[in-house]
């Protein structure tokens, strides 16, 4: 297939790494995506690279390996993975489907699902790492079921595609988003809103959350007691099921473990408090009030989730 006309010129200025070493390539990608397996068809000879930026909780990037490569993710962890090809092609197994992916057809893999892709040697991927909690808040369903097949040229997706190209091609826009977390958050929500508008969740998933009752009980318990020093055993007792059953259900229906859900809940509450807090209130106090006892880890987790530091959130509000 010939390369798509989608050329993300602005992203090229955000080169995360270049490497001919397989282990380094895997480790550098894992830092911004998640741990995964890379299986080259032979000895890796080409140069791999990744361009990557964050817009709030949305990650946008390109990945090329320079060689034919198989990428395996056991379970997409807490986000939706959207991928199509800028050049080359891929065969992807995801969401119970086998798909041919290129510049016109993309794949959207839900949290908790396995992702297995075989990429041609000339393949350069365009990837979006879309925070599952944000999709849940915008759709009203924390486990929204989105069709895994994405027809990039569909008229319904034209507004999303045009906005995505604008962001990826505009150095000035990316620079402004990097400098102003509020702009980044607005772009994040606009891109996700346009995607959902043009590629809506299945009607059944919008009407009914298929998660079992014990998982909903666990969520209600976490939402009511997130500020307390909860352990996994506390959530298991509230759900009244074995730990393995609860863990498997969270991974299947929420795309994350129970403790990851607890951390995400604490982070969401912390962000809301930081946005509404009085100027004299310390960030450390907000973190402690939301159940975080290690302030350094809180700051790292906050930036990973929202693409900005707690102090930057406070600065935008002021």
Swiss-Prot record:
Output one GO MF annotation: sequence-specific DNA binding
Gene3D superfamilies in alphabetical order: Homeodomain-like
Choose any GO biological process term that the UniProt entry carries and state it: catabolic process
Superkingdom classification of source: Bacteria
PROSITE patterns for the chain = HTH_ARAC_FAMILY_1 (PS00041), HTH_ARAC_FAMILY_2 (PS01124)
Instruction: Name a Pfam family for this protein.
Output: HTH_18
Q: What happens when the gene is disrupted?
A: Cells lacking this gene are unable to grow on anthranilate.
Keyword Metal-binding part of the UniProt annotation? no
Disulfide partners: none
Looking up NCBIfam families in the UniProt record yields: ant_diox_reg_AndR (NF041686)
> Can you name this protein?
Anthranilate 1,2-dioxygenase regulatory protein
Source species, please?
Burkholderia cepacia
